[in-house]
Amino acid sequence: MQEALLPPAHPGRFYSDFGPKPFGSGDQRLSSPNLLTNGGDLFYGCYSPFSPTRVLSPPPPRRAASFSHCSSSSDSVVDDGDGAGAAAATEHRLHLAHLALQYQEMANRFELCLSHLADAADEAAALRQENAELRVANNDLACRIAKFGGRQSSAIALAGDLRRLRLPKEQTVPALPPPPQSPPAALMNPVAVPEKQAVLPKSISIRSTGYQKLNQGGKHRVSKPVNVGSQRVFVGIDGAEGGEHKVGVKKEEPPMGGLEFEVYNQGMFKTELCNKWEETGACPYGDQCQFAHGVAELRPVIRHPRYKTQVCRMVLAGGVCPYGHRCHFRHSITPADRFSFGH
């Protein structure tokens, strides 16, 4: 018995059930045939209605395939973009790290410069302090040198003035007869005062018999200084007697053995040396000062004939005389004075 294969009554329905489904309105000639999921023959799946099973795996839609293809492409693009972004981020982080290192290095250099500046400031302050101390020391030394130089120049000026005045010493010197037909030795060879031992005197004192007066009873008494502006006194060197007369009164010429001076009373104008000028070399009063600024301005003072001829008892006893240079007694003690005071 022969079995004839009959075509199906509705071939379109058969192909619609088992054939490939159209995707849109495209050409279906290029569509691939369906394959069985269980690995069966293609013939039974495509043409035979008597296939062992009716379950067929549906073909994947083209849209899903296209979407998966696009997704894979986009994933690859995203992966490429992520790699480029990661590289850029890494490079940016490296750049920031490099900038941080540079900033730290600059901060370290700044701190080092600040420390050097602080050291330089301390050194400058120390140098300023040392300069100030040296300036004070130099000023002190300059003042001392000026004071010493002023005293030395004053001593030299005093020596020159004493040579010019040719004043005798306060102590009595025995008179020597001058040689015949020759000037006095004191006038030819004046006593030179050593410059190293020369000291500025507080006053120039000249002992004269004109200091005292005779009373009516004929007895000598020490009276007050003559109340006149000035007197001219002759001081004998070779034993000649001295005398005095008022200004404006004629008097005979003094002999060759003495000198004549214009003397003043104690306490008058310019009769005593200025202490301020002697200490510092300058006086704030200037020309208005009542005291002498140097030996050239110092005017002689008339004294008692026994002025400074006896030793002061207070000094001889070892005490301090309150009168100082104004004392009328001698403050220099000799061995003879000590011997006489002990007995």
Curated annotation (Swiss-Prot):
Entry's PROSITE patterns?
ZF_C3H1 (PS50103)
Query: What are the start-end ranges of the zinc fingers (C3H1-type)?
Result: 268-296, 306-334
Taking the record's annotation, the residue ranges forming a coiled coil are 114-147
Ordered alphabetically, the record's keywords are: Coiled coil, DNA-binding, Metal-binding, Repeat, Zinc, Zinc-finger
The record's listing under InterPro entries reads:
ZFP36-like, Znf_CCCH, Znf_CCCH_sf
User: Under the GO molecular function aspect, what terms does this record hold?
Assistant: DNA binding; mRNA binding; zinc ion binding
What PANTHER family does the database record attribute to this sequence? CCCH ZINC FINGER/TIS11-RELATED, ZINC FINGER CCCH DOMAIN-CONTAINING PROTEIN 15
What is the name listed in the Swiss-Prot or TrEMBL entry for this protein? Zinc finger CCCH domain-containing protein 39
